[in-house]
């Protein structure tokens, strides 16, 4: 069993990429449904606020995302989205029977800008939370950022540079993001080590086409 948590930016700066984001996410979920193994899916959409549209749904029951759920507005309360999701999943694991805790947990965080609107969590708190879950429970975190220094920003969250990547925030870059995320999810679900070149295709795209 794998715990999958997707934290997706829907702030105002994502305007124009709604259809690409929805299509990429749905394609990724469709592919994962064809893979072996069980998974629980949580999806958090964030702007000024965080909205949970899937709360630990069995993968087979995850519905298609539509424009009713994914629409752009507001600012970027990224710390609140990440901190809130870690707290929620962590508490469930803490109080669950040992045999009910998924063997693997993967968080995938995407943002096209810097944190600018969180009220509940700060960098220090979230960094400690992430480092604890990584060290104590082996959770994995991937950070995909556009229009920012993704590695530097990820480091403020306690996420290693080899788990962070800059992507080009356009139609092609968004589609590629979800292809690469899907490949990474497949590796984690199959208990294969997530190599440092998981992000190679995104890096190459940015080199070719610029940020």
Where are the regions that the model predicts?
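Acidic, low-complexity intrinsically disordered regions
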Residues: 1-211
């Amino acid at each position: 069993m794998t715990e999958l948590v997707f934290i997706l930016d829907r702030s105002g700066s994502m305007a124009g990429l709604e259809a690409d984001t929805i299509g990429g996410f749905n394609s990724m979920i469709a592919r994962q449904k064809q893979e072996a193994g069980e998974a629980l899916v949580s999806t958090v959409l964030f702007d000024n606020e965080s909205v949970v549209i899937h709360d630990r749904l069995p993968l087979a029951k995850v519905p298609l995302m539509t424009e009713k759920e994914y629409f752009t507005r507001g600012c970027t309360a990224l710390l609140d989205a990440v901190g809130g999701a870690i707290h929620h999943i962590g508490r469930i694991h803490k109080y669950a029977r040992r045999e009910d805790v998924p063997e693997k947990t993967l968080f995938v965080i995407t943002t096209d800008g810097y944190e600018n609107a969180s009220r509940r969590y700060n960098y220090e708190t979230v960094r400690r939370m992430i480092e604890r879950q990584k060290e104590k429970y082996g959770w994995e975190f991937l950070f995909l950022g556009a229009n920012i220094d993704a590695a530097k920003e990820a480091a403020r969250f306690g996420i290693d540079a080899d788990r962070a990547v800059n992507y080009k925030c356009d139609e092609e870059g968004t589609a590629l993001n979800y292809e690469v995320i899907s490949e990474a999810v497949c590796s984690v679900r199959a208990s294969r080590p997530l190599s440092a070149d998981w992000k190679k295709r995104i890096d190459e795209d940015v080199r070719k086409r610029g940020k």
